[in-house]
Amino acid sequence: MSARTPLPTVNERDTENHTSVDGYTETHIPPTKSSSRQNIPRCRNSITSATDEQPHIGNYRLQKTIGKGNFAKVKLARHVLTGREVAVKIIDKTQLNPTSLQKLFREVRIMKILNHPNIVKLFEVIETEKTLYLVMEYASGGEVFDYLVAHGRMKEKEARAKFRQIVSAVQYCHQKCIVHRDLKAENLLLDADMNIKIADFGFSNEFTVGNKLDTFCGSPPYAAPELFQGKKYDGPEVDVWSLGVILYTLVSGSLPFDGQNLKELRERVLRGKYRVPFYMSTDCENLLKKLLVLNPIKRGSLEQIMKDRWMNVGHEEEELKPYSEPELDLNDAKRIDIMVTMGFARDEINDALVSQKYDEVMATYILLGRKPPEFEGGESLSSGNLCQRSRPSSDLNNSTLQSPAHLKVQRSISANQKQRRFSDHAGPSIPPAVSYTKRPQANSVESEQKEEWDKDTARRLGSTTVGSKSEVTASPLVGPDRKKSSAGPSNNVYSGGSMTRRNTYVCERSTDRYAALQNGRDSSLTEMSASSMSSTGSTVASAGPSARPRHQKSMSTSGHPIKVTLPTIKDGSEAYRPGTAQRVPAASPSAHSISASTPDRTRFPRGSSSRSTFHGEQLRERRSAAYSGPPASPSHDTAALAHARRGTSTGIISKITSKFVRRDPSEGEASGRTDTARGSSGEPKDKEEGKEAKPRSLRFTWSMKTTSSMDPNDMVREIRKVLDANTCDYEQRERFLLFCVHGDARQDSLVQWEMEVCKLPRLSLNGVRFKRISGTSIAFKNIASKIANELKL
């Protein structure tokens, strides 16, 4: 037998299909036009004209960038006609090869036919010669992955509520003959009411009974054993296995199968053995035995899983059943009347809805039926009759039908408070007297956007690329869950920051699959410090107080990298029951403990090359281009990466550091030194006059790390003092908001984050919000914890 080719180390910025080492090649974005009305004159009222200086795409006013990759970026936007917030994914088609484009349009086609309350909704598709814009649902709760990092495992009642929604949505996809193939905690998002939204259909495909699929898709810890064996599969059964891993992760806060390299992980998956923690109920254990079955033929179907006892505890009168999609409500008179006042013709509205065009007309109709945005404290409602407060309605659906999975969902913030979402309600909900903005002229993407893209280039050190997997998710803070926080669940069993983000494999040919998955003898993941493209979520993102661009990750630390790891369950006092048979021996704990109180963990680092996204020929190309000889040591990997990036890294670093002021820690605040950008008080000069300014109030308080009754201005000064003491660069962008940088990009240890002083709702307390912008979670956790602990508030 010939020797297997070692797994190559792949740059984090490599896309799944073709690679640009230098990152995103910027192209000018031409003026966009609505796909349905190009020359209709539209008028603006005073509100839209006041914001004309902001860039627009179609009817969407672009706001901040919430994620980016080499060939795409995602921006938070507001629909100027309705005031609803959306996420706009902007994809540079000129950077994609034909295969990538084909998969991108397959993803769009699949999303158009999905209409489930627990699946991210596509609103509008705008296409120009060089650019594709996907307007999608914006979720404000972030990823389930980051929720678990911040809070630890869920109680089974909470996990059940989430898992019922997940199963309902996945079974709905299977009804439509669609298999997701990349189900994992990173691709499960939370909306404003903490309900599940399944994202990232970049690896999904349509399946036909009797026709086998053969592409390896998914993150290895979530991948079914038949994928590791290179066998062909029908489709749904690989999703069922992934759901078993997800359920285990929700309930235990760790992965059932993990390893220090792919070979070890593969062996554990093929054994099918996992440890059952003592706190897991027998019913939950029995459900896992139906999901995590090695033989795909004997693996339970989702229809059977829906009837499982654990799934329906507390829901005995409303057993989970397959989702019955209501008929589309295409004749909501109130919404149509409002659209007519905006300048749409009734025939145009009817044609767009009947034909399902996903143009500006259909998007406006859908958005009018969605839940209006909720304003945070301090933001004036007078910033628009762009939106209204009304009883939620159900998008296009005019039916009281709903899946039982959507009922009795407990808010994670308040475990006893029952929440309903807009999609659970039916019927029109828009008061006819409400004033909406008329349609503005279709504006081009203004120069501000281009400038921002150029400015954001400085952060591409940690960004990942986007091909057909171009959707980016922003999420809540990943970091330690401080006990001082005034809100948060009480079921934490380990400190935050212990979970590891999983990237995604794709191998389309058996030779690639075996080379990538069966090899692993020497490719210990602890030896690979180069990061790769993440299998990303949807373009939905977290709301302001808890948002973090998911794609913006730095390379892992070279030399002696400290890895973020999942916790192993302690032996000793904790009793375990075997999973399906014998226990899997516990993996050796990481040599780098996160803290003294952190449990032992198995190492499976974020962004290692063995978590890369591979596609057929590109795997072989990368072997020859990025790898030669035996597996490299950390220093070898880093040297290769540094050589590949040397042409751009220096300029990028200088751009980053030139924006910040680094002070000698010995000088501190007592030196009285000020720079040209700041007044004597240390506040930005243009902010000094607004002494009456107050911190904004947060809705989600679980991103708070420290609370205090101190004056917010004094808190900002204390934060700056601690940042100076830790040699952190920072820029005070707003009165209570600091953009911070720490580490050396040339050593792949650069971390960027925001610190903001915010007010806690209904309490006379202020808190410090940490939001990671880029860098590995362990590097961020280390510096954020150090700063939080040194703050004297």
UniProtKB/Swiss-Prot annotation:
It comes from Rattus norvegicus. It catalyses: L-seryl-[protein] + ATP = O-phospho-L-seryl-[protein] + ADP + H(+); L-threonyl-[protein] + ATP = O-phospho-L-threonyl-[protein] + ADP + H(+); L-seryl-[tau protein] + ATP = O-phospho-L-seryl-[tau protein] + ADP + H(+); L-threonyl-[tau protein] + ATP = O-phospho-L-threonyl-[tau protein] + ADP + H(+). SMART domains: S_TKc (SM00220), UBA (SM00165). The modification Phosphothreonine is found at residues 5, 208, 215, 613. Its EC number is 2.7.11.1, 2.7.11.26. ATP binds at residues 66-74, 89. The lineage of its organism: Eukaryota, Metazoa, Chordata, Craniata, Vertebrata. This is Serine/threonine-protein kinase MARK1. Highly expressed in brain and spleen and at lower levels in kidney and skeletal muscle. One of its GO terms (biological process) is regulation of dendrite development.
